[in-house]
Amino acid sequence: MKTSDYLKKYGIRLKKHLGQVFLSDDRIAKRIVKEADLKPDDVVVEIGAGAGTLTEELAKTGARVIAYEIDEGLAPILQERLSKYPNVELRFEDFLKARDVPEEAICVSNIPYSVTGPIMEKIIEWRFKKAIVMVQKEVGERILSKPGRKSYGYLSVVVQTFYEVRKLFDVSRSYFVPNPEVDSVVVEMKRKAVEIDFPQFKKFVSMIFSKKRKTLKNNLRPFLSVFEGVDLSRRAEQLSIEEIIELYNIWRRALECSEE
């Protein structure tokens, strides 16, 4: 049965405030799962199970699947599609409020458009060892972007600091119900071995990108004494990930000294 048929069968009305669009083509779901290269002993977290197209393909791998879905109105569809898979746990709750995501889990998700930014931050916070995520094409460009490009900014830096990223493939808007206004892209994220405090780091990155066209000297004005002798004439969008980490470490050490 097609996703659209399930929606009709249960009289599901899409909730605009949740930005609901559902993947309707199982070929795309199969390709995503193939890229994830899951093993039966893996623990997989899906954020936004929707109508279960991707969830069902994840279940077929034999891995333990924890599928989050904020809309309990989709329960009849998900329960019908997934009842034969004992390895699937449905959690009808907001992933952003989750408190017990398993360690060393893998995230495989079609990220809900309306909360992409907060969810990407949560993926970093939970330190998933790998993530295969489908996002809006424009968001994917920001995740993958390099210094000097218009799309390079806060999201590029926080994701690439903690993960190696690469583009896997594009997904046309025609593969969704209803058709969104934009195309999507599937991105792979592999965790790096870095020891950086994420909440503190994202605060610093947000600060240096607060006025994107201004120089570091302008955006770091309250902390200029900390960066004495450091060239702050460039803009944050011109800096590599490594250069930003160096600046962050100077700022972090200064904060630690001031608290002693």
Swiss-Prot record:
InterPro entries: KsgA/Erm, rRNA_Ade_diMease-like_C, rRNA_Ade_Mease_Trfase_CS, rRNA_Ade_methylase_Trfase_N, rRNA_adenine_dimethylase, SAM-dependent_MTases_sf
Source organism, top-level taxon: Bacteria
Primary enzyme class: transferase
Subcellular locations according to the entry: Cytoplasm
Residues binding S-adenosyl-L-methionine: L23, G48, E69, D94, N110
Recorded catalytic activity of this chain's protein: adenosine(1518)/adenosine(1519) in 16S rRNA + 4 S-adenosyl-L-methionine = N(6)-dimethyladenosine(1518)/N(6)-dimethyladenosine(1519) in 16S rRNA + 4 S-adenosyl-L-homocysteine + 4 H(+)
Main location: cytoplasm
Function according to Swiss-Prot or TrEMBL: Specifically dimethylates two adjacent adenosines (A1518 and A1519) in the loop of a conserved hairpin near the 3'-end of 16S rRNA in the 30S particle. May play a critical role in biogenesis of 30S subunits.
GO-annotated molecular function: 16S rRNA (adenine(1518)-N(6)/adenine(1519)-N(6))-dimethyltransferase activity; RNA binding
Cellular component, GO, one term: cytosol
Listed Gene3D superfamilies: Ribosomal RNA adenine dimethylase-like, domain 2, Vaccinia Virus protein VP39
EC numbers: 2.1.1.182
PANTHER family to which the protein is assigned, alphabetical: DIMETHYLADENOSINE TRANSFERASE, DIMETHYLADENOSINE TRANSFERASE-RELATED
Protein name: Ribosomal RNA small subunit methyltransferase A
Assigned protein family: Belongs to the class I-like SAM-binding methyltransferase superfamily. rRNA adenine N(6)-methyltransferase family. RsmA subfamily.
Organism of provenance: Thermotoga neapolitana (strain ATCC 49049 / DSM 4359 / NBRC 107923 / NS-E)
Gene: rsmA
PROSITE patterns: RRNA_A_DIMETH (PS01131), SAM_RNA_A_N6_MT (PS51689)
